[in-house]
């Protein structure tokens, strides 16, 4: 049996649907969770879906994924631009890591164009709104089945 795909969302994503919907869309994080669970289920895989505004909690979940996940999808949000500690945690993984962003950071402010997480990511999906998560699930599935 394939281990679940862990999906982690960083700070402020609990406000998805109400915070800057012109950038991040109108779907809530619960909507995203439902879509990810359905997409994964269609491939015979389950999802562990979590969100935290706290860097240390995200790092603990990355450590947990070392043993319990087949792949990790992470939307680090603002921590992608600032957290070397999160990068270091991700570098301990031997499973596929897919970095996921709702918007396209390369088309936004200069400070958003670099993410530390990308240095540990197998691949990046960005700019497709809530569908970025589903596309990341598909990418993860493809990598664990390869």
UniProtKB/Swiss-Prot annotation:
One of its GO terms (biological process) is quinate catabolic process. Pfam families: DHquinase_II. It catalyses: 3-dehydroquinate = 3-dehydroshikimate + H2O. It is an enzyme of class 4 (lyase). Its EC number is 4.2.1.10. Pathway: Metabolic intermediate biosynthesis; chorismate biosynthesis; chorismate from D-erythrose 4-phosphate and phosphoenolpyruvate: step 3/7. Keywords: Amino-acid biosynthesis, Aromatic amino acid biosynthesis, Lyase. Transmembrane segments: none annotated. GO terms for molecular function: 3-dehydroquinate dehydratase activity. Substrate binds at residues 75, 81, 88, 102-103, 112. The record marks 19 as: Transition state stabilizer. The active site is at 24 (proton acceptor), 101 (proton donor). It comes from the Bacteria. Belongs to the type-II 3-dehydroquinase family. Catalyzes a trans-dehydration via an enolate intermediate. Homododecamer. NCBIfam families: aroQ, PRK05395.1-2, PRK05395.1-3, PRK05395.1-4. This is 3-dehydroquinate dehydratase.
